[in-house]
A protein has these predicted regions:
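N-terminal strand-loop element at the rim of the active site
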Residues: 14-33, 42-45, 62-96
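A short beta-strand/loop micro-motif in the catalytic core of glycosyltransferases
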Residues: 175-184, 190, 202
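Carbohydrate-associated surface elements
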Residues: 185, 207
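A short, glycine/small-residue-rich beta-strand->loop->alpha-helix junction that serves as a flexible
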Residues: 41-55
Length: 219
């Protein structure tokens, strides 16, 4: 998303990130991928952000360091500007917790975030249903099946609707979409509960931030 002088995005940082970006850049160049759009429910600056948001931000930062243009579209985060730049990638925060889904899709269809070479959808309970409208390279990140979590965050009727959407309505549309999850246990649960083709569900371990290192033994 281009910024003019009046809406120049502030620089934000989530800490020191150290890695070699050469291999990522080479892989992207060979695949003809120079610009990636990411659709996410929440931003890292959201007060309720968790592992999904941290993972998305870390990956986007590494892509940006490899020379890939990354635009991440999320819902707004209280106290944060609508647009920002964090660790080399652009963040666009518009719409509330529920309107983010139709508005993000509309923005992509209307080309408001510019061209893209690939699309990443983060399926965090409610999907963006990218297989129905996105053409070209795309993948979906699905960390886990929410299932029993719906009643914890929504009233009974809405919780049942969420469970129905996640387990029955959405999965058939994703049968030809590459699904990326973080562990073999999550993959097994996805295959069991969502009945997606095993060949399309891939495990990519998240790794460990280099800021963490083994400590000394306690005396």
């Amino acid at each position: 998303v281009p910024f003019d002088d009046e809406t120049q995005a502030p620089e934000e940082s989530v800490g020191d990130v150290r890695w070699s970006s050469t291999k990522i850049g080479d892989l992207a160049a060979d695949a003809g991928i120079g610009r990636i759009h990411v659709l996410a429910w929440r931003d890292l600056d959201d007060v309720e952000a968790g592992g999904s948001e941290l993972h998305a931000s870390a990956v986007a930062a590494r892509w940006a360091a490899a020379g890939i243009d990354v635009v991440m579209r999320t819902s707004h985060a209280a106290g944060s500007p609508p647009r920002a730049r964090r660790d080399g990638y652009e963040v666009v925060r518009h719409a509330g917790r529920y309107l983010i889904f139709p508005r993000a899709v509309a923005a992509e269809l209307l080309g408001r975030h510019g061209r893209r070479d690939a699309l990443v959808e983060i399926w965090n309970g409610v999907p963006f249903l990218s297989p129905l409208w996105a053409r070209g390279r795309r993948a979906t990140w699905l960390h886990h099946v929410h299932e029993d979590m719906w009643p914890m965050v929504l009233p009974p009727k809405l919780a049942r609707a969420g469970q129905l959407l996640e387990r029955r309505i959405a999965p058939p549309f994703y049968r030809r979409t590459p699904i990326v999850t973080l562990s073999e246990s999550s993959r097994s649960h996805i295959l069991d509960r969502l009945r997606l083709p095993a060949d399309n569900v891939h495990v990519v371990p998240p790794g460990i931030d280099p800021g963490f290192s083994p400590g000394t033994e306690a005396p």
